[in-house]
From Swiss-Prot:
GO cellular component terms given for this protein: extracellular region
Taxon lineage: Eukaryota, Metazoa, Spiralia, Lophotrochozoa, Mollusca
Keywords for the protein's UniProt record, in alphabetical order: Disulfide bond, Secreted, Toxin
Tissue note: Expressed by the venom duct.
Domain notes per entry: The cysteine framework is XV (C-C-CC-C-C-C-C).
UniProt-recorded name of the protein: Augerpeptide hheTx5
PTM notes: Contains 4 disulfide bonds.
An example molecular function term from Gene Ontology annotations: toxin activity
Compartment(s) where it occurs, according to its Swiss-Prot or TrEMBL record: Secreted
Length: 35
């Protein structure tokens, strides 16, 4: 499985089954993924 790096949220890394796209001030959309 693709590892989700920190940074802008991308569909290929933000698998909705495992990851959430969060909108954070000053950073924009980021991937937040549970291990």
């Amino acid at each position: 499985n693709e590892v989700c790096p920190p940074g802008r949220c991308e569909p290929y890394c933000c698998d909705p089954r495992k990851c959430k796209c969060l909108s954070i001030d000053f950073y924009g959309l980021v991937c937040n993924c549970d291990s």
